[in-house]
Amino acid sequence: MAVANDYIVKDIGLADYGRKEISIAETEMPGLMSTRAEYGASQPLKGAKIAGSLHMTIQTAVLIETLKALGADIRWVSCNIYSTQDHAAAAIAAAGIPVFAVKGETLTEYWDYTSKLFDWHDGGMPNMILDDGGDATMFVHLGLRAENGDTAFLDKPESEEEEVFFALLKKKLAEKPKGWFAGLADSIKGVSEETTTGVHRLYNLAKEGKLLFPAINVNDSVTKSKFDNLYGCKESLVDGIRRGTDVMMAGKVAMVAGFGDVGKGSAASLRNAGCRVLVSEIDPICALQAAMEGYEVVTMEDAAPRADIFVTATGNKDIITIEHMRAMKDRAIVCNIGHFDNEIQVAGLKNLKWQNIKPQVDEIEFADGHRIILLSEGRLVNLGNATGHPSFVMSASFTNQTLAQIELWTNPGKYERQVYTLPKALDEKVAALHLEKIGVKLSKLRPDQAAYIGVSQTGPFKPEHYRY
């Protein structure tokens, strides 16, 4: 591991390898490259100090360097202990951008690295957060809560992750002067949030009146949720399962828990690989969608003894329980493509016999002798066992992130302590930036046609409530 004053990466010698892959990714990320060309001269992010917590991949490296090209100062960590691509982290460190990310870092290291986002190299503090999952945001919120005297929760962790996180907060409270977290909260002008789980956290904070700064929900931009969540998972899920297990997918029975955008992409991914796909759902609308797509909609109890492959994609907890896993076939494959690891009751497996097969692949034996194969310890399988979504689809997501950062930074008085989404015009702009790359020719409305349907010739073409 290479440790320097302002970076921690696996091996700084991987920087050249990372730089070559970044160069290739740039060709596949027209939205970000167009954003550099459009905004580079005006430097809209000059003065912004962005604390970034998002999977440290090759695609994220292109995002980081786009933010830098627009004037931002940046510190970065990965938002998952297994999702870092070490050559990407090395390339960013070699470019002089502080990054703290190692594939396979411990939970203690993860939270220590996250805390480094807020200890700025010039002795100051960040003034913006770019988040994925909400951990950086929660560091500020829970730190301030404890600093203000409400510390009882620190002694009541509900998971191993919370135990480590709360221990870090106690350490920071002891190290930092009184008022440090209050100053940090005041310094932050806004956060842009990448994923469903983090967005849920933001809406809960806003509902309780506890959100400390304005937030933009990037996840619910159409060019994020209907592309990254759907088409990204459609390609990356099976990639992760295959790299982890080398299993023949065709003919297998696969179970997908959840039929939101991620579940839809996951089910399609498995079907395209030749699997017979089962789906579980709590929402009657999503259940009906799954059934009309030709999937068999069942409960997890029905699927447990039937399926060969299990994928959770719900954003909820305890979707696959110990009892479900006890009922599974020998060497059934169990994995998750939701943000957190609590969709599968991994903690309840800790007292069983574990055999590590290779990095992020474990075989767990139950008392009766039957085994399951668990991928990435229940964390994101597509990033833990593979390299995540392709560059092109991530360009759309990350262009939204860049525009959200520009919007929050350049219009500080426009937003209250609430959760916002980007306007439809920007959503359409992000989509338009990606058309030429794949040879799309867009039709144009004539003035009379635009008037007939009541829209501008240049858009937006749909009302805010339109469901794509």
Swiss-Prot record:
Its EC number is 3.13.2.1. PROSITE patterns: ADOHCYASE_1, ADOHCYASE_2. Its cofactor is NAD(+). Substrate binds at T57, D132, E194, K224, D228. The keyword Cytoplasm applies. GO terms for cellular component: cytosol. Gene3D superfamilies: Adenosylhomocysteinase-like, NAD(P)-binding Rossmann-like Domain. It is found in: Cytoplasm. Keywords: Cytoplasm, Hydrolase, NAD, One-carbon metabolism. It catalyses: S-adenosyl-L-homocysteine + H2O = L-homocysteine + adenosine. It is an enzyme of class 3 (hydrolase). Pathway: Amino-acid biosynthesis; L-homocysteine biosynthesis; L-homocysteine from S-adenosyl-L-homocysteine: step 1/1. It comes from the Bacteria. Binds 1 NAD(+) per subunit. InterPro entries: Adenosylhomocyst_ase-like_sf, Adenosylhomocysteinase-like, Ado_hCys_hydrolase_NAD-bd, NAD(P)-bd_dom_sf, S-Ado-L-homoCys_hydrolase_CS. One of its GO terms (molecular function) is adenosylhomocysteinase activity. NAD(+) binds at residues 195-197, 229, 258-263, 281, 316, 337-339, 382. May play a key role in the regulation of the intracellular concentration of adenosylhomocysteine. Belongs to the adenosylhomocysteinase family. This is Adenosylhomocysteinase. It comes from Methylorubrum extorquens (strain PA1) (Methylobacterium extorquens).
